[in-house]
Structures are given as C-alpha cells and as structure tokens.
C-alpha cells in the first residue's frame, strides 16, 4: 500500500499500539525500549577513564556535522513504479522508527545520568542521542518528499515500551549499531560502484551515517567493559550466544522477507544478509567473549531452511499452522546451539 498522510491525520487516526503506514505488527516490527536506568547510573567509569575520555572528545568534535547538509534535497531522482515506490517508502518508515527509538533510549539514559549527578555520562549519551535524532530527521525529510508525515514525538505514546535488563540493552545496542554499520557501508559501497541504482540523494549520506553507527558501537563496547560481570563466565557466553543468534535471525528474516528493497538497488538480499552477518560476527570479537564459529558453514547454510520454514508457517492454514511453527522453532533451536569460539576481547578487569 502506498500511504499519504499528514502528521495530524496519522496522529489522530492511530490508537494505542497502532502503527504508521507501511508497518505491520509482527515479530520484525521496530520497537521502543526501556531499561534499568538506576542501575546504569552506577556505572564505574574510572576503570575505563582513558578510553572514555578519548571517545568523549571524538563525540564532542562531531566530525560528521558538516557531512549532513540539512538543506540538501532528499527527493527521489528516479521515477519508480507504484510497487517500487511502496518498497522505498516502507524502508524509510521502518528506518525512521528504528532511529527514533534509538534517540529516545539514548536521550532517556542521558537524562537519568544527569539526574544521578553523572554529568560526563549524561553528556556522552546526549551525543549519541544527537546522532540518532539527526538520522531520524533525514529519514523524516525523505518521507515528507514522498508525501508521508509521521508524528514521531507522539508515536511512543501509541506503542508500549519493551523492558530489557541493562545487560540485554548493552548487548543488543552494540549489535544494533555494528550491524547497522555493516548494512550502511555495504549498501554505500554497492551504490558507489553502481551509481545508476541510487534512486535518491538520501543514499549519499550513508557513508557518514555508517561512521556514526560504528562509533556508537565502540561507545557501547566501552560501557560493557565497565560492567565486567556481563561478559564473564557462563553469563557472558549465554548472553553472547543469545543476542548474536537473535540479531542474526531477525536480520535474515527482515532482509529476505523485504528483499524487494535490496533488489530495487540491484543487491542480492541473500548474499547481502550473509555478508552482513559474517562481518558483524567478526567485528563482535572485539566486544563479546564468545562469537559463532562459521568455519563449517552450518550456521549460514541453515538460513535458507529457516527462511522457508518461516514463510511456510506464515502462509499455513489455521489447521496446519502449529505443525509449521514447530518445524520453524526446531530449526532455529538447532541454529542457536551451533558451536561458538572464544574471543580475545579486551577486558578492564
């Protein structure tokens, strides 16, 4: 569906837990999060003082400020078919909700740090919130060019926030930023090699965008190191396994279920998904105590079976749905249990 709505009409027509145009309620829908803010305020920064100061200075410098031209046109350059137009709009909507979700979480963490008299950490997370707001703003402008205005400030009021413990938030945030980095940089490299496939100037901003994502991931890694218990022993291994598996599974289902966006850019969604997962798993060796071992190829090979089972489950009749669901769960459980390898990630203590 190609939706055109004003901010007021979107805001006025959506009830609680209803979604903007191009979003359906399912397991892959972007969400808003909350966490243990009081616990986060107790972060022991002194064990990471040198790294923190270096990252603080880098974030304060805001190297990408001039790379995001707020006056640049974000209108599509190419005429798209109604189907492709809907595909492009759907990508923008999902992306703007994800970026705005990150902004809200970072902003709330920043505010809580300041209230707890932790001004350095408060300012640090304000820098992260600044970047996420900038990204959401650019995506919002691109949507307006398509005739879609989403009332972002009111959207969280219509969506129940999901609570995650602090350790879950840090693991998932790290992966979210790093997988975002690899997604943006791979798309950017592809479009530089095939400029005729860049249907809008929005893609010109993907290079500084991916730099922000990479930097944010490093910031979250530093925060994880301030909580050594999160990455030690059995707890560190199970958290590494769970979040790598969850993020990779979600990425596979999201990319392949919405492969028409990547095909619009002349990108093979299956190969793109594989490369993003490989690179993110490798990058995670710098933060997590354990990562998946891809040497025997089983983890990556199972994606096709899992995707087919997922599609069969969603398309199945009411009577056969439980059978298809059990097959899907069996496959993802087998993938979850595949071998991992220990990393040499730096620890403060």
Curated annotation (Swiss-Prot):
Sorted UniProt keywords: Chlorophyll biosynthesis, Iron, Metal-binding, NADP, Oxidoreductase, Photosynthesis
SUPFAM superfamilies: Ferritin-like (SSF47240)
Involved pathway(s): Porphyrin-containing compound metabolism; chlorophyll biosynthesis (light-independent)
Enzyme class: oxidoreductase
Swiss-Prot/TrEMBL GO biological process terms: light-independent chlorophyll biosynthetic process; photosynthesis
Catalytic reactions of this protein: Mg-protoporphyrin IX 13-monomethyl ester + 3 NADPH + 3 O2 + 2 H(+) = 3,8-divinyl protochlorophyllide a + 3 NADP(+) + 5 H2O
EC number annotated for this UniProt entry: 1.14.13.81
Protein name per UniProt: Magnesium-protoporphyrin IX monomethyl ester [oxidative] cyclase
Organism: Prochlorococcus marinus (strain MIT 9211)
């Amino acid at each position: 569906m190609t939706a055109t709505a004003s901010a007021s009409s979107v805001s006025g027509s959506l009830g609680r837990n209803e979604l903007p145009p191009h979003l359906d309620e399912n397991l892959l829908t972007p969400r808003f999060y909350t966490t243990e803010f009081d616990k986060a305020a107790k972060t022991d920064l002194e064990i990471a003082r040198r790294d923190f100061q270096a990252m603080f200075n880098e974030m304060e410098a805001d190297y990408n400020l001039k790379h995001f031209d707020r006056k640049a046109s974000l209108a599509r350059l190419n005429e798209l078919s109604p189907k492709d137009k809907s595909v492009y709009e759907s990508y923008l909507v999902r992306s703007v909700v994800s970026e705005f979700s990150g902004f809200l979480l970072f902003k709330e963490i920043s505010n809580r740090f300041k209230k707890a008299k932790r001004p350095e950490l408060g300012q640090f997370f304000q820098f992260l919130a600044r970047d996420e707001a900038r990204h959401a703003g650019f995506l919002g402008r691109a949507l307006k060019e398509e005739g879609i205005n989403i009332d972002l400030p009111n959207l969280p009021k219509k969506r129940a926030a999901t609570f995650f413990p602090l350790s879950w938030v840090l693991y998932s945030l790290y992966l979210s930023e790093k997988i975002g980095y690899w997604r943006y940089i791979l798309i950017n490299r592809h479009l530089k090699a095939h400029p005729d496939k860049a249907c809008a100037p929005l893609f010109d901003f993907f290079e500084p965008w991916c730099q922000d994502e990479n930097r944010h991931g490093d910031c979250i890694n530093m925060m994880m190191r301030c909580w050594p218990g999160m990455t030690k022993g059995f707890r560190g291994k199970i958290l590494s396994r769970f979040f790598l598996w969850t993020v990779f599974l979600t990425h596979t289902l999201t990319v392949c279920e919405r492969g028409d966006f990547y095909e619009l850019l002349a990108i093979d969604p299956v190969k793109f998904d594989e490369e993003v997962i490989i690179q993110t798993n490798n990058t995670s060796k710098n933060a997590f105590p354990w990562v998946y071992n891809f040497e025997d190829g089983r983890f990556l090979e199972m994606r096709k079976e899992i995707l087919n089972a997922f599609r069969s489950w969603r398309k199945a009749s009411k009577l056969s749905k439980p059978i298809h669901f059990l097959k899907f769960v069996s496959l993802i459980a087998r993938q979850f249990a595949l071998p991992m390898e220990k990393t040499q990630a730096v620890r403060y203590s």
